[in-house]
Amino acid sequence: AIVGTVIFALLAFLLPSDVPVDRNGKIDWVGAVLGTAGLIVFNVAWNQAPASGWDAPFESILLVTSILLLLLFGVWEHKFANPPIMPLGIWTAPSFLALILVVLFSFMANGIFLWYMVAWLQLLRGASILDFGVQWTPFGIVATLGTFLAAWLIPRLATQWILAIGSAAILVANLLLATMPVYQSYWAQVFPATLFMALCPDFVYVAAQIVASNSVRRRHQGVAASLVGTLNLYGNSLGLGFAGTIETEVNKRRVGAEAVLGFRAALYFGAALGLVAVLVDLSFVRVVKDVREGWSDPADQREVEVELEEGVSTAVEGRQ
């Protein structure tokens, strides 16, 4: 992180300034606030519930408030925003809604796996932080290799299958943890589960970006890519809220060694999310192998030509 900060700070001074393509562009600040606030409050409601309980009055208030904010966001984007920060027409693009569900469920399952793997090893098996760090090493190696493997597969395999591999990987990973005994050798189930889990983020993220880019119009590609990127962290966090509620309910009136039942229930829920992601992907996401060059849609090609003309004109004005 320190090295990255130094490098990016230097690049901020060394790189030339971007040439503005749309000098008169506007940002939909109202939509940004409504959408972000709605998602945050919804997340807080679910992640606070395991500790406070759903019978706490503020939980209902938070949940209702989040829904109202998201409804207001939709109304604002549809009726008043110009231009909208998230054009609602993007949801009618082929495979896009199904893609978002697959990505959300996959990353929810991913967050559940990560949290309960740490909890199982440290709380039930007594592993130290250093022990866990060593046992987590295979993740970094396989995840790095998975990035290159996903990129290699893109021109060779239909993207929905790459997405399915990532979702199936987190399904298997959660099942391996959910079915293991409290005390067991690391190599028996935790190690293979870590290897499977390492494939999920890169396969799902890379494939989802390809599907999003192929599904929407060129002008909406930035929005689609940003939404997929947001679901990466948001899904991880939201999944813990759902899983935490399940764990809390299962472990009511259970103490000691019986607490593992709550862990298992949460991990089975993560596996169920992975299974639903696989089924939705195979049923509704359809993108062929990406071997195109340029823009196949004439309207998109015209947008590129206009942007290039405006960019050249702006650059000439800047030099003058």
Q: At which residue positions do the language-model features occur?
A:
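Helix-loop-helix hairpins in multi-pass membrane proteins, especially solute transporters
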Residues: 1-31
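Structural signature of hydrophobic alpha-helical transmembrane segments
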Residues: 1-5, 63-66, 136-138
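Structural signal for membrane-spanning alpha-helices in multi-pass inner-membrane proteins
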Residues: 8-15, 42, 47, 70-77, ...
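Flexible cytoplasmic inter-helical loops of multi-pass small-molecule transporters
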Residues: 18-30, 79-86, 291-301
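Phenylalanine-glycine-rich, low-complexity intrinsically disordered regions
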Residues: 19-21, 36-58, 73-76, 80
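Select subsegments of transmembrane alpha-helices in polytopic membrane proteins
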Residues: 27-36, 164-166
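12-transmembrane solute porter fold
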Residues: 57-58, 83-254, 258-284, 288-289
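Intrinsically disordered, low-complexity terminal tails of fungal membrane proteins
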Residues: 287-320
